[in-house]
């Protein structure tokens, strides 16, 4: 035991290649294991299970699945049989819904029911997918109190498949599942985060009683490594320890000057990546869709007009969170004209912005001042109408103007355009990745170019650096090349200053009454 204690003191500094060379590890007094590979060595040192081996699959796999999807279902089946849950984190556009449907259909072939929890905007996607499979016992719960809605609630008490939104999951479970579901599927599962969130607690409760749990998301680490924890807890219980231990181990957790825990960083990334591989299936488009057309990116830094500079400086002289919001709005207004120029030239495009006010303004200016027809999608548009507008744009050749929160995820827009325009660079980098994937996915035949518009001497100088930092954390843990490419594209356009340095320079210039110097 003393040898093991000595070894563990510096185990954190050893690479997995070094661990693999150890002929035996003393993991308990009087018990020695033989030579093991790096993965198993890490598993034993960390107290977690080794990766489950692929087992012969007794699932009814339908025709039409691609080879990588068949392999994905096999792997998921092995993981859920071993661990009780699995994380399906394939890149956007690789058919996660189809794989999840195949898995759940197989797991409930003889008996059992499936509860699918998803954002409202993908309810119809699930209904379409289940219909393609020939599933007849499907009930979709929608908000409302008409006779049709009341009938759906009654049907949900016996239906094999029940599909509902995250907001309604708790009520659906309590009123329609007298016996726990055999399979619980959480689509766009990154929406479940925040240890104290009511939604997360309810899903954790449901998950404890479900036989199998599957969480689907192309962006499991929504912003920072700390976002993983709640997802992992719902799927695997205490396998990753307490939230505090997770933050300290993997999120660079440290006590700050105010006595709180700062968990915004990343630490032991290789170790976390290794552990996640036991529980997760993840493939990139570039690795499995060889026929997918290329994706390129460009960043265009716009010079601010005198009016934009005045608005931005006036906003930054304010105080509190409102000042940041005002500064972001000033930045977005300052980029409208160059964005209009680019969209007018492209004619067919997908344009994302941040707020519906900006989306309405851009769409109106394109239609009335630039002779550029387009459809408009914002959050106040009913979910059912969004897909029809996309189909209209695809058939008519019109552009699409949308807010990133209303159309940046869950909607298939391949064939709508080959040019994507990012008017607003979101603080959450994985929103950008999801938005890019609306075009760059199965069914797209033309090369896709995404153009990011940023304005010098504005909040974009801060936001871009913040996004680059977060993408670096993602790449360290997930090892995903496409997000590393986005990080490099944005990072190559800025200098070595941190976002704090840039903010300090902005405030210093304001105090001195002058303008910023050349940016980037």
Enumerate the language-model features and the residues they cover.
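Conserved Walker A/P-loop ATP-binding site and its immediately adjacent core
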Residues: 111-132, 222-227, 355-356
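Conserved helicase ATPase core of P-loop NTP-dependent helicases/translocases
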Residues: 148-152, 352, 360-361, 371-407
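A conserved SF2-helicase RecA2
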Residues: 427-436, 440-519
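Conserved pre-motif I regulatory segment
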Residues: 51-89
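Conserved helix-turn-beta segment of the N-terminal RecA-like "Helicase ATP-binding" lobe
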Residues: 122-145, 235-239
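Conserved helicase/translocase motor-coupling segment
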Residues: 287-368, 386
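Conserved P-loop NTPase motor "coupling/switch" region that bridges the ATPase
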Residues: 147, 157-158, 183, 200-285, ...
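SF2 helicase motor core recognition
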Residues: 170-174, 223-225, 359-363, 386-390, ...
């Amino acid at each position: 035991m003393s040898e093991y204690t000595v070894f563990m003191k510096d185990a954190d500094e050893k690479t997995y290649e070094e661990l693999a060379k150890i002929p035996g590890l003393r993991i308990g007094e009087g018990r020695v294991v033989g030579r093991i590979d790096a993965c198993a060595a890490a598993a034993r040192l960390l107290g977690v299970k080794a990766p489950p081996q692929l087992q012969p699959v007794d699932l009814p796999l339908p025709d039409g699945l691609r080879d990588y999807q068949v392999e994905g279902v096999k792997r998921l089946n092995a993981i859920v049989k071993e661990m009780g849950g699995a994380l399906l984190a394939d890149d956007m556009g690789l058919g996660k819904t189809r794989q999840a449907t195949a898995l759940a259909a197989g797991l409930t072939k003889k008996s059992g029911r499936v509860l699918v929890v998803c954002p409202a905007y993908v309810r119809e996607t699930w209904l379409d997918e289940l219909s393609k499979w020939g599933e007849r016992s499907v009930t979709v719960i929608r908000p409302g109190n008409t006779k049709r809605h009341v009938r759906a609630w009654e049907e949900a008490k016996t239906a094999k498949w029940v599909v509902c939104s995250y907001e309604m999951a708790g009520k659906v479970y309590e009123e329609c599942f007298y016996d726990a579901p055999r399979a619980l599927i959480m689509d766009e599962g990154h929406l479940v985060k925040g240890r104290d969130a009511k939604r997360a607690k309810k899903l954790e409760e449901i998950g404890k009683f479900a036989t199998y749990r599957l969480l689907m998301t192309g962006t499991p680490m929504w912003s920072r490594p700390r976002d993983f924890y709640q997802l992992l807890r719902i799927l695997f219980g205490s396998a990753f320890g307490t939230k505090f231990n997770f933050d300290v181990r993997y999120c660079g957790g440290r006590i700050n000057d105010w006595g709180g825990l700062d968990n915004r960083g990343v630490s032991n990334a290789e170790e976390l990546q290794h552990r996640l591989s036991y529980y997760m299936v993840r493939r990139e488009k570039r690795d499995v869709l060889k026929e997918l057309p290329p994706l390129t990116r460009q960043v265009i830094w716009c010079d601010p007009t005198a009016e934009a500079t005045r608005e931005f400086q006036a906003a930054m002289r304010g105080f509190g969170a409102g000042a940041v919001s005002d500064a972001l709005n000033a930045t977005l207004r300052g980029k409208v004209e160059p964005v209009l120029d680019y969209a007018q030239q492209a004619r067919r495009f997908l344009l994302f912005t941040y707020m519906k006010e900006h989306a309405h303004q851009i769409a109106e200016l394109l239609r009335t001042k630039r002779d550029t027809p387009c459809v408009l999608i914002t959050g106040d548009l009913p979910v059912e109408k969004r897909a029809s507008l996309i189909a209209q744009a695809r058939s008519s050749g019109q552009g699409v103007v949308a807010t990133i929160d209303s159309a940046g995820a869950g909607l298939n827009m391949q064939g709508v355009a080959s040019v994507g325009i990012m008017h607003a660079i979101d603080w959450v980098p994985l929103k950008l990745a999801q938005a890019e994937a609306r075009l760059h996915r199965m069914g797209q035949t033309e090369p896709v170019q995404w153009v990011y518009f940023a304005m010098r001497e504005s909040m974009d100088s801060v936001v871009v650096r913040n996004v680059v930092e977060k993408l670096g954390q993602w790449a360290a843990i997930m090892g995903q090349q496409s997000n590393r490419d986005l990080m490099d594209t944005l990072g190559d356009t800025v200098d070595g200053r941190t976002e704090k340095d840039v903010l300090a320079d902005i405030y210093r210039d304001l105090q001195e009454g002058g303008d910023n110097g050349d940016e980037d």
